[in-house]
């Protein structure tokens, strides 16, 4: 089992359940959210190492703009957090927009289990490597003048 907590955000309960069952045997923690409005509170309340984010949340909408909006919000508060976008309505242009927007990867539904797990592992590895090369700077305590 690999270290890491994955947050899955998708409005489809079947997708959430399928991904949770797949990933709970592979990673330390799996969190799910069916409403993207809960993303920020989840990220604020517990550590998350990667987000799997659906691109469409409203019925009849398949532009991917909702997912791109939430990707931007995640980037604002946690720029180092890898986000893998999920969609059933993918095309090259949408994938390019997601990757240019900061997504770590782009996965079409239905996904191949081994391929998805490999993409998650790669994104987690890249994040860990990046943290080793560029550690997060913590503010130093102010010097005391006596």
Language-model regions, residue ranges each:
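Two-component/phosphorelay signaling modules centered on CheY-like receiver
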Residues: 13-31
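Acidic, metal-coordinating helix/loop segments flanking the phosphotransfer/catalytic sites
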Residues: 32-50, 59
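C-terminal output helix
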Residues: 38, 92-93, 107-120
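Short amphipathic alpha-helix used as the core "switch/output" element in two-component signaling
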Residues: 60-79, 97
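The C-terminal output helix
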Residues: 121-135
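AAA+ ATPase active-site-proximal loops
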Residues: 135-146
């Amino acid at each position: 089992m690999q270290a890491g907590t994955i947050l899955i955000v998708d409005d489809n309960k079947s997708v959430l359940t399928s991904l949770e069952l797949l990933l709970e045997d592979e990673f330390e923690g799996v969190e799910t959210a069916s409403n993207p409005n809960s993303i920020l509170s989840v990220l604020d309340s517990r550590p998350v190492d990667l987000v799997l984010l659906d691109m469409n949340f409203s019925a009849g909408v398949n532009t991917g703009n909702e997912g791109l909006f939430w990707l931007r919000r995640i980037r604002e508060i946690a720029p180092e957090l890898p986000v893998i976008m999920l969609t059933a309505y993918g095309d090259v242009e949408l994938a390019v927009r997601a990757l240019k927007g900061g997504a770590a990867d782009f996965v079409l539904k239905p996904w191949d289990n081994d391929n998805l797990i490999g993409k998650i592992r790669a994104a987690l590895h890249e994040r860990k490597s990046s943290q080793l090369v560029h550690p997060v700077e913590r503010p130093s305590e102010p010097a005391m003048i006596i």
